[in-house]
Amino acid sequence: MRKIRTYQEVSHTTESELLEQVIEQQERLADRLSQVKRLIAIASGKGGVGKSAITANLAVGLAKKGFKIGATDADLNGPSLGRMLNVSGAKLRDSADGVEPAMSPDGVSVMSMELLQNEADAPLKWREPSLGGFIWQSSLETGVLREFLGDVVWGDLDALLIDVPPGTDKIKRLLELLPSLDLMLLVTTPSETTRFVVAKSIRLAQEAMIENIGLVENMESHVCPSCGHASRLFGTGQALEEDAEEPLPQWGRIPFDPRLGASTDQGRSLISTEPDSVTAVALEDLVERVSKYIKGG
């Protein structure tokens, strides 16, 4: 029986042991993911754009359509997807084939670092050599993500959603780990600062030869609850589509709604709590676009 190591056990792994495990883990990873029809990364490069909330709503929306969906939080230091999908406090179960993921009330298989920690609010601490600590930590983080994907019994999935943490370096490591990624959705907002950072993520994905890259513009506008008028939150900047070497498709434009954050904080999706809201309808449009992609359309 194989168990995913706790973060204390990961921290005690020596460099030589880590290197010896990589080939074995890669083989397990390839075997495990062969049962997954579509590998979909939701990334940005910039924090604070609502990426995890969109991932959670996308996962729930696809599951409600009857798809077998898995979701993993690749943010080891600040995981939030487990809470948003209402599996906080769930106990992981070992099986002969590996570790069973937590199952959300909406039928989404979930794996997150918070499920491996004894205390939900405990910060993740890495034991590292006195020299080269940053490089060591990066290797450990990549190794843990490899285990999340390779040692968890995902089973036959229509899609596995990977919530990528902020930072273009995190995107780069994911692309190195999963060169066969099927789709990368890059979440942005209309702000000029976010556009600048996400443009770098676009370039990384294009250089990695990811065939399918889509943009999701979150907080695209604010809809007045009284009159229904939509107004821009950030003004108008150059479209990200124009930054790309080749035109990028816009997969979704999501209006700002404070209830989106409030619902995910409670472990519920906006498409379930406020299905008729403008933002929920926009999220459903994104779900429909991704569902067609999963089917091969």
Enumerate the predicted regions with their spans.
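Residue-level signature of catalytic and energy-coupling elements of molecular machines
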Residues: V36, G47, D73, L81, ...
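Phosphate-binding loop that captures ATP/GTP phosphates
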Residues: K68-G70, A74-P123
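Short, hydrophobic alpha-helical segments
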Residues: V287-G297
